[in-house]
Curated annotation (Swiss-Prot):
It comes from the Bacteria. The keyword Transcription does not apply. Binds 2 [4Fe-4S] clusters. One cluster is coordinated with 3 cysteines and an exchangeable S-adenosyl-L-methionine. It is found in: Cytoplasm. This is tRNA-2-methylthio-N(6)-dimethylallyladenosine synthase. The gene is miaB. It holds the Pfam family TRAM. Its EC number is 2.8.4.3. Residues 159-389 form the Radical SAM core domain. The lineage of its organism: Bacteria, Bacillati, Bacillota, Clostridia, Lachnospirales. GO terms for cellular component: cytosol. Catalyzes the methylthiolation of N6-(dimethylallyl)adenosine (i(6)A), leading to the formation of 2-methylthio-N6-(dimethylallyl)adenosine (ms(2)i(6)A) at position 37 in tRNAs that read codons beginning with uridine. Monomer. [4Fe-4S] cluster 1 binds at residues 28, 63, 97.
Length: 456
């Protein structure tokens, strides 16, 4: 890192100004956390962050969960190429899940020769080394690791928020759902040592963080790869003991692995937020088998019953795919049945799209677009009906809200988040950001509330 830092300083001195950087994040919260580390490394070697993609060093941290995500990135890379013509000092780096696919790297080499650095998901800690290699060789640097069992600790990180932070507890995925590319680009499951996780959280709290989001592709698998196994329930109990930490969230649990121990820990916790994101994907047992989800409709509903028995007011959200290959009207009605029985606060809904490299992409009986679209609209209607009934129940109540930002549409309002992950907008000032305040939930607006802050 020292060699790269010296090289960056040399160029900055020649230009008579600091070199700037910009990191653009595509995709999930795992990518967002990786981008914070990339920003931390760039600041450590002497770059200064910029909001503009006209910066001297631009990083695209890519997502490849859907084919259109790739298309979007290719378009943006072309835009960067035009910017680079105007700025000979500009450097472009591409990383993330998309770069783990060999055909993507080949396309970058042939069609986007102005790109300087290409690396993947397993070696972001090498960014400074790769930058130095580009400075010295004057050629495109490509460094893709297909697999790794390495977890590098103590990387510098530049948090997006001062009051909340994501904390990786594990990397990779072993589930191989038939529609999903993630295990192929993120690798097999690897868990961080609990001591390293707790150390990071304590450091974050010392800097003012009051809420952490524990991150993993399947957090319920945490600890299985450790020399001395630790369960996710045990880790939650350890995190609960961190003084000064006020809220704990986690994402994402897999329904097949969410244990009674985790439910019990949540029930007794004073810090774990009243929310579980529990992806169902489909309500049809037959489709769940094709998806390789490893649970049935009945298994899922029984799990929801156990959760609600322990925590009657729990907020549940989910992911649902419509139009998976072979989906019949009966299969779809099973999905609507689950939505009605569970009563989700909200749902991330998707029309299935082929993802090359996954088993589902070659399955027979792909669903016609018009059929999938019609079912999608019926699903949205059912979810809205369900969520509005649930949200209305909390109108008039007073709840604790973590204030996150000035409202984007009206700067006289602040936007905060309830324990159940629902947004609340209310009159206030930016000095409240990062504080937990009491707010009366005056009016439900569907997926958010208008509120009134209560005076002490």
């Amino acid at each position: 890192m020292a060699l790269c830092k010296a090289e960056v300083k040399k160029v900055a001195d020649e230009l008579g100004r600091p070199l700037t950087f910009n990191v653009q994040t595509f995709g999930c919260q795992m990518n967002a956390k990786d981008s914070e580390k990339l920003a931390g490394i760039l600041e450590t070697i002497g770059y200064v962050e910029s909001d503009s993609e006209e910066a001297d060093f631009v990083v695209y941290n890519t997502c490849t969960v859907r084919e259109n995500a790739n298309t979007r990135v290719y378009g943006r890379i072309g835009f960067l190429g035009n910017l680079k013509k105007k700025n000979p000092h500009m450097r472009i780096a591409l990383c993330g899940c998309m770069m783990q696919e060999s055909h993507v790297v080949e396309k970058i080499k042939k069609s986007y020769r102005f790109v300087d650095i290409v690396f993947g998901t397993h070696n972001i800690f090498k960014l400074a080394e790769l930058i130095y290699a580009r400075h010295t060789t004057k050629k495109m640097v490509i460094d893709i690791w297909k697999e790794t069992d390495k977890i590098v600790e103590e990387l510098p990180s530049e948090q997006k928020y001062k009051f909340k932070a994501g904390v990786n507890i594990m990397y990779g995925c072993n589930n191989f759902c038939s529609y999903c590319i993630v295990p192929y680009v993120r690798g097999r499951e690897r868990s961080r040592n609990p001591e390293d996780i707790i150390k990071e959280i304590k450091q974050l709290v010392s800097k003012g963080v009051v809420e952490v989001m524990l991150l993993g592709q399947n957090v319920n698998s945490y600890g299985k790869t450790l020399d001395e196994p630790v369960s996710f329930a045990q880790l939650l109990q350890m995190v609960e003991q961190v003084e000064g930490l006020k809220r704990i969230r986690f994402m994402t649990p897999h329904p097949k692995d969410l244990s009674n121990d985790v439910i019990e820990v949540m029930k007794n916790s004073k810090k774990i937020c009243n929310h579980i994101h529990l992806p169902v994907q489909s309500g049809s047992t037959e489709l769940l088998m094709k998806m390789n989800r490893k649970y049935t409709k009945e298994d899922y509903l029984n799990l929801v019953d156990r959760i609600k028995m322990a925590m009657p007011n729990i907020s549940l959200t989910t992911d649902i795919i419509v139009g998976f290959p072979g989906e019949t009207e009966e299969d779809f009605l099973d999905t609507l049945d689950v939505v009605r029985k569970v009563g989700y606060d909200s749902a991330y809904t998707f029309i299935y799209s082929k993802r090359s490299g996954t088993p589902a992409a070659t399955m027979e009986n792909q669903i016609p677009e018009e059929v999938a679209n019609e079912r999608f609209q019926r699903l949205l209607t059912t979810i809205r009906e369900s969520s509005s009934k649930i949200s209305k129940d909390d109108e008039g109540k007073i709840a604790e809200v973590l204030v996150e930002e000035v409202n984007e549409q009206d700067n006289s309002l602040m936007t905060g988040r309830l324990s159940n992950n629902v947004l609340v907008h209310f009159k206030g000032t930016k000095e409240l950001i990062g504080n937990i305040v009491s707010v009366k939930l005056s009016e439900c607006k569907g997926f958010y509330y208008m509120g009134e802050m209560m005076e002490d």
